[in-house]
Amino acid sequence: MANAGVNETVAVAVAIDAPGVGHDHGAAGEVRRPSTRRLAPAGSGGRLMAELLGVFNGLTERMGEDVATSSSSRLLFRALKLALPALRDGGGDGGGGQSVSRALVVAASLADLQMDAEVISAGMVRGALDTGALAMADVEAQLGASAAGLVEESLKVKRAPSEVDVADEEAASALRKRCLSSYDIRAVILELAVKLDAMKHLDVLPKHQQRTTSLEVLKVFALLAHAVGAGELSLELEDLSFQRLYPQAYAHIDQWLSSQEDDCKRVIAASKEELLRALTADDELRCTVTGVDVMGRYKSRFSTMKKLVKDGRRPEDVNDILGMRVILDPRPGGGGGGDGDGGDRACLRTHEVIKAMWKDVPARTKDYITRPKGNGYRSLHVAVDMSEPGPEGKKRPLMEIQVRTREMDMAAVGGQASHALYKGGLTDPEEAKRLKAIMLAAAEVAAQHLRDEPAGDGGQTTAAASAATAGNVERAFQLLDKNGDGRISMEELTEIMEDLGAGGHDAEELMRLLDANSDGSLSSDEFALFQKRVKLKTKLENKDDEYKEILKQKLQKVDDTGLIHVYRKNLSDKLVLV
């Protein structure tokens, strides 16, 4: 009946000697990283077939019986046959093997989000299209017009942030609304999975592009993930962006959470086993469910920073460092599925078992099952005190336990859009309209937490401020354009660099970086873009310094109870991440 596990995304990987899916099981609370096992060499026919079948089996198992129909299986198989050779032969960053591995990670993420075969197939070939290894005509011919249309729409979502200044909140808000209202939601979710993979491979990009991409993710894509209800995907996108944009602040948060990690892991591991035994031994619960999963939860660095810096909490008031999740499988015909009375009763009974085991904190109990959130989220959140008894006992943060059914969890993890797709929805225009309205509202609520992030014009939105900025850029350009022909030539740039103590090689490298149209000179528009990058870099560094000082003051106060322990190490060699 019981099955204790960890609720983390596992990358699809293929062993050389045997097909299958690589499951990277780690300690509770750790983020699962994709397996890096080498794929079969192109010349080995038997191994290639093993690779194809292994990936196919792994993906269809993730999709579940209700999604992996015979027609969807055929589509997925065609996508694999199309994508794997193209990616391996086409190469890309890190070679063909890495391109294949990344495509499989994207496909696995989409399968975990309960996307249908069209979306997963589109995700499989997106990487090959991005690298030019496949043409859109190939995709349409092999996978059909619908899958090709999803790929095209996902590319539009990808390009959308480049059309606006995402650092400007009004522009970012309008862009989020456009993505949610104008594009197929499945294409948005496809781009979110691709973006998550891209954020894990940012080191191949120039530093300025790393910052630009991270800001786009923080201001647009993480909020889109929240809007469609993919909360865990949103948290991971936020954390990856946070690490790149504010490396010093991230280091302080990571250091503090890591200092408590060993004790937290021990507590979570012991508590998981204890709770699992209690739930599987409970006769009343056994009558209503067929299975129970208990798992540890990952603690977001970005959400911790928001609580400490933006909400003004003290470190000892951040109570959800410890976390578990209980997922229940209600018995068929026991009053309904995850939304039925049987599932609801099982969740409430689990709450009773938890209260009998540990000291709960009623004021922090949140019943989103009886009273769901506006976006449809349903779960029971319970807080319990895990401190050791007695005056000499070790004090610990509260443990938050989330209790939900399998169907509730799928809706929470995959989002309302994927849940509706899974249930056969989004075919009714009114239902699709209602879901989009919910998503638009959710995106705006989430955006409230980011109001003080760097703005494109320093927070000013007036025409005068924009004109002043443009004037400064124009004056600087005129000073560098010594012959006044409206362009900065290679000779002029070299002279400037030599005046600054650099050489001709540095001038050539800078020209390659800034010369967007590769005509050998810099136009005023290209120079303005460079100025914009410099301005954004300065603002991010200033904000990082501000966050760092706030966190330094809060987190370097050692609590007498032993709750807060901060290692006073020199982190200067670890902070240059952007």
UniProtKB/Swiss-Prot annotation:
Activated by calcium. One of its GO terms (biological process) is guanosine tetraphosphate metabolic process. Residues 468-503, 506-537 form the EF-hand domain. InterPro entries: EF-hand-dom_pair, EF_Hand_1_Ca_BS, EF_hand_dom, HD_domain, NT_sf, RelA_SpoT. Residues 1-45 form a transit peptide. It comes from the Eukaryota. Pfam families: EF-hand_7 (PF13499), HD_4 (PF13328), RelA_SpoT (PF04607). This is GTP diphosphokinase CRSH3, chloroplastic. The gene is CRSH3.
